Amino acid sequence: MNPLIFSIITFTMMLGTGIVMTSSHWLTMWIGFEMNMLAIIPILMKKYNPRSMEASTKYFLTQATASMLLMLAVTINLVHSGQWSTTNPLNPAASIILTLAMAMKLGLSPFHFWVPEVTQGVHLPSGLILLTWQKLAPMSVLYQISPMINLDLMFTMSILSIAIGGWGGLNQTQLRKVMAYSSIAHMGWMTAILAYNPTMALLNLTIYIILTTTTFLTFMTNSTTTTLSLSHLWNKEPLITTIILVTMLSLGGLPPLSGFLPKWMIIQELTKNNSIIAPTTMAITALLNLFFYMRLIYSSALTLFPSMNNTVMKWQLNQTKSTALLSPLTILSTMILPLSPMLMLLE
């Protein structure tokens, strides 16, 4: 793709997200979603092949359906209130339809089927954008309407997402699908706390984006896409492999690492609001995520035959791509937990 055209498309995608996040008018918010959707399609098809074409088509159809539901919700609200402003209280029916539209855009269960297929069909940089940047606009809309969200609907979708995000990733050998199911589970955690403490949902989103970006950047340094290539990476780039494994443990929510912080704070907040069954169910189903990350670590690092590293290293190494962002992101992915006393100010 021509670099100038790619820059224009990327700018349009970012501008669309910015319009959604800053808009106080439902029509301009819908325009922002459309700009973002139409701009990301060429990014998903940057490396053109039948798989990326299929993935882009699935993504387009899903997002177009969600945009249609968004306009339906806005129209219902307009008929009842006569207002276009996002700050006005929503009609209950409009609130439910709008929540379903944003759930479809985020990939929450039961609208999660497109996420693994689309992520698997595109190359790693596009997958990174899909699982990080594309979550910002729908989450900002849910943040704005959080006082009017139907609590039962949101909790049902959240717990389903956490469970399906864990079950779906159990037998995966493709790392992009693993990250997709991890994304579904993390979205479930974010939306579970949205009605009680929206700021905490944004904290969870920030930590999720840091962890996912770190993981994808380490995959991109050596074009690692399968469990097999991850196990081969150990002899070629032991440091990068260690970063991948530690970041995966953090994504799973292992206590000493950064990924444990949002889960801990969300469970604490839910129990303060006299909700006991939901956080218990969420904590138990989150173990499924940790299990499939542990399975990846076991198959890639702990099943190697004992040998000196220098005896099995390749004599001819490919040039690895370096990135300046990887070092600070790795630190953030593993060491945010000591900052948690300051984050208690969010409560």
Curated annotation (Swiss-Prot):
GO terms for biological process: mitochondrial electron transport, NADH to ubiquinone; mitochondrial respiratory chain complex I assembly. Its main location: mitochondrion. It comes from the Eukaryota. InterPro entries: Complex_I_Subunit_2, NADH_DH_su2_C, NADH_UbQ_OxRdtase_chain2, ND/Mrp_TM. The lineage of its organism: Eukaryota, Metazoa, Chordata, Craniata, Vertebrata. Keywords: Electron transport, Membrane, Mitochondrion, Mitochondrion inner membrane, NAD, Respiratory chain, Translocase, Transmembrane, Transmembrane helix, Transport, Ubiquinone. Core subunit of the mitochondrial membrane respiratory chain NADH dehydrogenase (Complex I) which catalyzes electron transfer from NADH through the respiratory chain, using ubiquinone as an electron acceptor. Essential for the catalytic activity and assembly of complex I. It catalyses: a ubiquinone + NADH + 5 H(+)(in) = a ubiquinol + NAD(+) + 4 H(+)(out). It is found in: Mitochondrion inner membrane. The chain crosses the membrane at residues 1-21, 25-45, 59-79, 96-116, 122-142, 148-168, 200-220, 240-260, 274-294, 325-345. Belongs to the complex I subunit 2 family. This is NADH-ubiquinone oxidoreductase chain 2.
